């Protein structure tokens, strides 16, 4: 399935790397989120993870990620039970865009609120990590999600020195 019809060589290298933890120090607008969405949809369709927890620096980036995921869902003709916005914690105003597959797996796209990751498990994707309001707190909240061996992905452009 992975070929140069859909991906550039550096994107294929990212997909072929099966490491549990991957960090992508990247440039802007190179299709990193696009290729990550492909990996995440495949992981859910194939039940390699129970859930994907994706966080980007702002809500528009989370929406763009979900749009990419929707494209891959249609491409694979995957059966989806629900998709839309859900409230994770109304007291803390934490919402997520969610795609729920028929097999029970889910993709969640959240804003950069670190509290959104508390008590969650599964694959974690931190997009534009260096641009989150509080990357240290986000890391502390997200890291335990991978305790049971699920993957962690960090993708980011630079935001000054010592930002990654």
What are the residue ranges of the model-derived segments?
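Phosphate/NTP-binding elements of NTP-utilizing enzymes
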Residues: 1-164
């Amino acid at each position: 399935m992975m070929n140069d019809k859909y991906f550039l060589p550096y994107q294929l290298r990212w997909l072929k790397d099966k490491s549990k933890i991957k960090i992508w120090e990247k440039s802007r607008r190179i299709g990193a989120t696009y290729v990550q969405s492909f990996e995440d949809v495949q992981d859910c369709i194939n039940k390699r993870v129970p859930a994907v927890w994706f966080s980007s620096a702002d809500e528009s980036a989370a929406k763009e990620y979900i749009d990419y995921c929707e494209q891959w869902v249609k491409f694979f003709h995957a059966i989806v039970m629900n998709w839309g916005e859900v409230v994770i914690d109304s007291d803390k105003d934490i919402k997520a865009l969610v795609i729920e597959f028929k097999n029970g797996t889910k993709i969640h796209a959240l804003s950069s609120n670190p509290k959104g990751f508390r008590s969650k498990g599964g694959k974690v994707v931190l997009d534009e990590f260096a641009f989150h309001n509080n990357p240290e707190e986000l890391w502390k909240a997200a890291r335990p999600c991978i305790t049971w061996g699920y993957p962690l992905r960090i993708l980011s452009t630079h935001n000054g020195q010592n930002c990654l």
